[in-house]
């Protein structure tokens, strides 16, 4: 059913306990993505426990308990269909690797739903997630004002929260006038699949129909080819077969290519996807390809393949805009954590802290700060300890974002805004 529909990755973001999982669960439930036999099993159990009314929240609690017990109904890769799209819900914040995944492209979201609880309004993580979504290039967002049942579906409260959110999203560059704000109750299923009589004052679409107002993400086929290598195999009788996903541009048979920072050249002999030979590969395609002139030891994970005439950019240094997500103390000049960018993991040094920014408005708050701490946004100068490919986020955003990791956690997220390239030839 999904093959002929465009696919979108959807991030569900918002403050803890504002109802993200319940909203995802409810959307899956309403679109028929939670198998009937699971619902039936819960219904029977509910009856046996004397819960005459079968409540959706109870299903969600059970799913949660089962996850805690280690029995997974695969809510990690949650997918559901709308009339227009099929959606995969990518890791929601709260998962440790959410930020890293979002940035390194393991789950680059095309759009987001921001869930905000009506009684609370904008909270700390609401701000952080909105800022991150914007920093990470999510241009389309729908706002679900949840737990409307807790405020008796009061239009006045809805409008107060809407105003607060409009101010917040405007600061980071979303347009409130083009954004849908939907009053919902995920627990009660209000305004999820269809408009409810509980909110006669609300004239917009319910949440699931609203998802079909998202624009289909365009494939960056007009950009130069960039294919970060995930792995490289040596296959007898064929030769070297690198494997990876096309991020931008088009790979064609017969094309002359360069691998950076390995600084090796070759020619594409054949391209394969799902064990079938294809004449060309476009963004989103996971392919294996055979290259004439390349030996197995020449290239490795983290190298990037591009056209010989427009090879991938190797940075000697680069300027980045970063947001510090969590650091036990402070980041100072000389700090050298690992940068995860496309498929590379390279240790890089903070060589200059240029300025601290107001994370919400992007205005300069302080020139040449001495340190950065959790919650700070800044412009910094970075020097990789060994050659690595990174691109300017304005030109090739897919290779311009990165996560900064240290001691097993994501310290910061960022994007490359200028590069001092290394001359490779």
Swiss-Prot record:
Its taxonomic placement starts with:
Archaea, Methanobacteriati, Methanobacteriota, Stenosarchaea group, Methanomicrobia
- Identify a single GO molecular function assigned to this protein: GTP binding
Q: Name one GO cellular component term.
A: cytoplasm
The UniProt entry's sequence similarity note says: Belongs to the TRAFAC class translation factor GTPase superfamily. Classic translation factor GTPase family. EF-Tu/EF-1A subfamily.
Report the EC number(s), separated by commas if there are several: 3.6.5.3
What CDD domains does the annotation carry? EF1_alpha, EF1_alpha_II, EF1_alpha_III
Where Mg(2+) binds, per the record, is at 21
Which InterPro entries has this protein been placed in? EFTu-like_2, G_TR_CS, GTP-eEF1A_C, P-loop_NTPase, Small_GTP-bd, T_Tr_GTP-bd_dom, TRAFAC_GTPase_members, Transl_B-barrel_sf
Q: Please tell me which top-level EC class this enzyme sits in.
A: hydrolase
Where GTP binds, per the record, is at 14-21, 91-95, 146-149
What is the stated purpose of this protein? Answer: GTP hydrolase that promotes the GTP-dependent binding of aminoacyl-tRNA to the A-site of ribosomes during protein biosynthesis.
Q: Give the start-end ranges of region G3.
A: 91-94
From the UniProt entry, list the residue stretches annotated as the region G2. 70-74
Q: Specify the protein name.
A: Elongation factor 1-alpha
- The tr-type G domain sits at 5-221
């Amino acid at each position: 059913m999904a093959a002929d529909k465009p696919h979108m990755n959807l991030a569900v973001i918002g403050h803890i306990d504002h109802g993200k999982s319940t909203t995802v669960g409810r959307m899956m439930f309403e679109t028929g993505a939670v198998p009937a036999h699971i619902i039936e099993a819960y219904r029977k159990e509910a009856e046996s426990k004397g819960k005459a009314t079968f409540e959706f929240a109870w299903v969600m609690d059970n799913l949660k308990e089962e996850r805690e017990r280690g029995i997974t109904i695969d809510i990690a890769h949650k997918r559901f269909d709308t009339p227009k799209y099929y959606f995969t819900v990518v890791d929601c914040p709260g998962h440790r690797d959410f930020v890293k995944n979002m940035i390194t492209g393991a789950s680059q979201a095309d759009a987001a739903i921001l869930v905000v609880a009506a009684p609370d309004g904008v909270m700390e993580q609401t701000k952080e997630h909105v800022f991150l979504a914007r920093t990470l290039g999510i241009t389309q967002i729908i706002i679900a004002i949840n737990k409307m049942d807790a405020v008796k579906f009061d239009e006045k409260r809805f409008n107060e929260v809407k105003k607060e959110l409009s101010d917040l999203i405007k600061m980071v560059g979303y347009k409130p006038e083009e954004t849908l704000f939907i009053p919902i109750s995920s627990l009660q299923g209000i305004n999820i699949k269809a408009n409810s009589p509980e909110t006669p004052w609300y004239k917009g679409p319910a949440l699931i129909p609203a998802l079909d107002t998202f624009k289909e993400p365009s494939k960056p086929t007009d950009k130069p080819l960039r294919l970060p290598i995930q792995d490289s195999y040596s296959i007898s009788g064929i030769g070297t077969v690198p494997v990876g996903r096309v991020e931008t541009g088009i790979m064609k048979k017969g094309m002359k290519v360069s691998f950076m920072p390995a600084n090796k050249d070759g020619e594409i002999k054949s391209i394969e996807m799902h064990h079938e030979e294809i004449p060309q590969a476009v963004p989103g395609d996971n392919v294996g390809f055979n290259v004439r002139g390349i030996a197995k030891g020449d290239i490795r994970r983290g190298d990037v393949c591009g056209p010989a005439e427009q090879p991938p950019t190797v940075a000697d240094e680069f300027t980045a805009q970063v947001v510090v997500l969590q650091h036990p103390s402070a980041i100072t000049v000389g700090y050298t954590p690992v940068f995860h960018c496309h498929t590379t993991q390279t240790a890089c040094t903070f060589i200059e802290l240029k300025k601290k920014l107001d994370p919400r408005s992007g205005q300069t708050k302080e020139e040449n700060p001495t340190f950065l701490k959790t919650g700070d946004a800044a412009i910094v100068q970075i020097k990789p300890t060994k050659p690595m490919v990174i691109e300017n986020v304005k030109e090739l955003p897919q290779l311009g974002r990165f996560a900064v990791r240290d001691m097993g956690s994501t310290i910061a997220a960022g994007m490359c805004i200028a590069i001092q390239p290394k001359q490779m030839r």
